[in-house]
Amino acid sequence: MKIDGRPYRTIFPEADGDAVMVIDQTRLPFAFELKRLTNLDDAAVAIRTMVVRGAPLIGVTAAYGMALAMRQDASEAGIERASATLAATRPTAINLRWALDRMAAVLRRAPESAREALAFTEAAAIADEDVASCRAIGEHGAKILSEIAAKKDGPVNVLTHCNAGWLATVDWGTALAPIYVAHDAGVPVHVFVDETRPRNQGAALTAFELNAHGVPHTVIADNAGGHLMQHGQVDVCIVGSDRTTASGDVCNKIGTYLKALAATDNRIPFYAALPFSTIDWTLSDGVRDIPIEERDAREVTHLTGRTDDGAFATVAVVSPGSPVANPAFDVTPARLVTGIITERGVCDASEDGLAGLYPERRRAA
């Protein structure tokens, strides 16, 4: 995608190969800055502190983190150490584990002397595959939006939660990819953007993306979605996913489940958009089995923003001494999901639906 007319990916190696560059998402939407990753620890910290975030991008960053680690230690012990360090950064996104397993398998087949170069080649391949997958998700999802547009006057009103756009992937995004493809094809689209507390990833990141692409949108408070649905102002919901089970349960940013409940109650289609690397074929009960990351209470108790004079300030918003819980994700059961949009097409949120698109994955599970 483009920033000020210049194309960017969220992660890419420097031209001289000395470092891997990422967009520092903690600085958005008020500053666009690139950050250099030069070693394993840099990559791990970037994932843990959410300089990079979004399940697909976390996976690609982990792949490049493995490549950077091979510069210091390409031994079997080095592979194990790098994989363990990166795997410990964030527990919910399955793309992280998928990318690490793929990298380790490729590296172990090569002699130690060849592992550094091979690691960068494989990480680049994973990044390119992510771009292709997200573009395909966009094409399949745009057909849904086009069908809705053909049946109504005015724009298709899409509600989305958190950020599942190009900032969450290498390019294009998952939930936002259909919106970009449809918009570029001339389909009138308007997006309701949940602010997505506590980190405000919708207000800060999704709105930033949509602004940059020229897509009409409105930022709304997290609790406004149900009201809009009741009054016929939402045509479809599209969200991303950090882990989806083989049975179609969708784990996504906290608050997604509530949107799905409201959509079901108001007979509004609710889709999850995700690549194959987000599917965990080993799990069937997402509510029971998906580990949910518990993040720092300070994300809830404090807000950081830009003041009217251009300075940045962090302020407390919670009564001092009150206990805080901060689960980062929730699970939407498959029964509430209209369909899953993947790079291979759209399917029912069910074991049979997913297996129909990925028969080889089901056999391999």
Swiss-Prot record:
Transmembrane segments: none annotated. GO terms for molecular function: S-methyl-5-thioribose-1-phosphate isomerase activity. The active site is at 242 (proton donor). It comes from the Bacteria. Keywords: Amino-acid biosynthesis, Isomerase, Methionine biosynthesis. The record marks 162 as: Transition state stabilizer. Catalyzes the interconversion of methylthioribose-1-phosphate (MTR-1-P) into methylthioribulose-1-phosphate (MTRu-1-P). This is Methylthioribose-1-phosphate isomerase. The gene is mtnA.
